[in-house]
Amino acid sequence: MMRILLFLATNMAVMLVLGIILSVTGIAGNSTGGILIMALLFGFAGSLISLFLSKTMALRSVDGEVITQPRNQTERWLIDTVSRQAQKAGIPMPDVAIYHSPDVNAFATGATKSNSLVAVSTGLLNNMTEAEAEAVLAHEISHISNGDMVTMALLQGVLNTFVIFLSRVIATAVASSRNNNGEETRSSGIYFLVSMVLEMLFGVLASIIAMWFSRYREFRADAGSASLVGKEKMIMALQRLQQLHEHQNLEGSLNAFMINGKRSELFMSHPPLEKRIEALRNL
């Protein structure tokens, strides 16, 4: 979940800044073609900037430390396990990091398979058995081997393009009028207000689509973990998370697997644990 939140937050920030620039300067002009070209350029700029900053931002957000030289048995086990799984998945060895947090959490990020990162919290290492942690690591390795971050960036770029394009086409129509001479004029104030409101509304709809795709990716990563270490280990890891959820108040934590059941599934980046376990059992 962390990698998704960071990606979307960065993307939204870039989109907001670029959207204000477009609205204030009127760079795209009034023509549909001009708006479409600018929507493509600015839409993909937000997602690609988010993608290439994802690894650095993720590490900084959790104050993670990349393991360059294992200092203890746990770090050695992590490096050996990730190395073995990466080789089996056919991808280059990613960087491995540990960060201090009581949350049971792990995530993978990075712009390319050759420049990726797998990070694990101390909470996960302290609350899971080696078999369960191995399954979680395999899940993250599967995200990398599936190219999920790149695919997510491309999808977000397309969604951004539609958000920008539709909001500005509608805003242009609403703000445009004809004077007594038959010349078309446009109220910049109305255009700015309408385009910003529509961008926020369409942005919510785009987020629903992005979250649906994220849930689909999680099922694929679970299946990938099952192929790397066996589905029983992955089921055990998810069941462990269920047990922890029952005994700890983890609501609001950035967790790679834990899902807050009070939220609508439409806005979940991960499917409910019950559905994931059921899907694994049906493999």
Curated annotation (Swiss-Prot):
Cofactor annotation: Zn(2+)
Any GO BP: proteolysis
PROSITE patterns named in the record: ZINC_PROTEASE
Cofactor note: Binds 1 zinc ion per subunit.
Name of the gene this protein is made from: htpX
Similarity section: Belongs to the peptidase M48B family.
Binding site for Zn(2+): H139, H143, E218
Gene Ontology molecular function, alphabetical: metalloendopeptidase activity; zinc ion binding
Active site (catalytic residues): E140
Main subcellular location of this protein, as a coarse class: membrane
Keyword tags: Cell inner membrane, Cell membrane, Hydrolase, Membrane, Metal-binding, Metalloprotease, Protease, Stress response, Transmembrane, Transmembrane helix, Zinc
GO cellular component, as recorded: plasma membrane
Transmembrane segments: 4-24, 33-53, 147-167, 190-210
Superkingdom of this protein's organism: Bacteria
Coiled-coil residue spans: none
Record's bilayer topology term: Multi-pass membrane protein
Stretch forming the signal peptide: none
Gene3D superfamilies according to UniProt: Metalloproteases ('zincins'), catalytic domain (3.30.2010.10)
Name listed for the protein in its UniProt record: Protease HtpX
